[in-house]
Amino acid sequence: MKFQVDRDILAEAVAWTARALPSRPSVPVLAGIRMEVGDALNVSSFDYEVSAEASLPVTTDEPGTLLVSGRLLAEITRSLPDRPVDMSLEGSKAVLTCGNATFTLLTMPTEDYPTLPEMPPSTGSVGTDIFAAAVAQVAVAAGRDDTLPVLTGVRVEIDGDTITLASTDRYRLAVRELRWNPSRPDVNAAALIPARTLADTARSLTSGAEVSIALGLPGQPGADSATGEGMIGFEGGGRRTTTRLLDGEFPKFRSLLPDEFNAVAELPTAAFTESVKRVSLVAERSTPVRLSFSEGQVVLEAGTGDEAQAVETLDASFDGDDIQIAFNPQYLLDGLTAIDSDTTRISFTIPAKPAVITGKPAGDDPAQPDYRYLLMPIRLAG
């Protein structure tokens, strides 16, 4: 086996593939990156949960396959000079040469490496930038408690040309709808995807114009052929990744979103975000930021008489009876930074019920905003 490849292309592919390497592999070969040379160089990794594979152009007259330490290969390729990279298999060792630098790496038996799962049939495609932004908006609200695995996922619902993404950790709920290009106009499916894996995948597949989404539900065509478990795959820009779906029943989130409100505030997103950041500097762990809305303004407060305190007043448009409400400052900031509008709209029912944070629709558009962030308030003393 012998090949030559561009240094930057190789380094990017290896770094991307190494993301899927397990931190504590159950068997040594899972710490490896597999390199297979044929018409192209395929660089892959797999930990039985997530697979990653990148295809890149290569010059070769000796095809073959090798398996080397993934993290070591990533560190080496990242530090190489800007020269073509030559790599060959010599007995049980891989020799990598770039400029005047030569590295000799121990290989692992490729026959012990698991077979990568096949990509399910494509369900449709969506623009990479749109998809990455939508996933980032929603993944922020996913739970991080592995004892509640259902809440660590993002619910993906496909209905024709619309995808709905939703996540919740019980304290907030993020929902985003976006248009896409389905493979069939009548496609209808739902899946629960690990949030961290989905967010990482969406961020890393932006090199192409579109990302193809391939969903294989349990017991249906496209499921993992080895286990029968549900699986989803993403492909774009010469890169492919798959992950197993989470089991469990996601909360019926649509019933949590109110249709009618008693008060609505509108504020400049950037100024409001900065105000929350400043005021929350004095908020100790789990201490809320208090918001008092009245005609023409909102007063932000944090801290108590026995601690450091902060107060700031910000101009705001407000329609409804005066309201005082308190939020976890980090959860509030997570929602505000996900808003892609210059103006933030906060809609209230009563102070004890969740508020809904959205961007202000352009003009007088009455349509439902494509992103909604529902945030539970913290009960105020007294």
Language-model regions: role of each:
Residues 1-382:
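Structural preference for solvent-exposed beta-strand-turn elements
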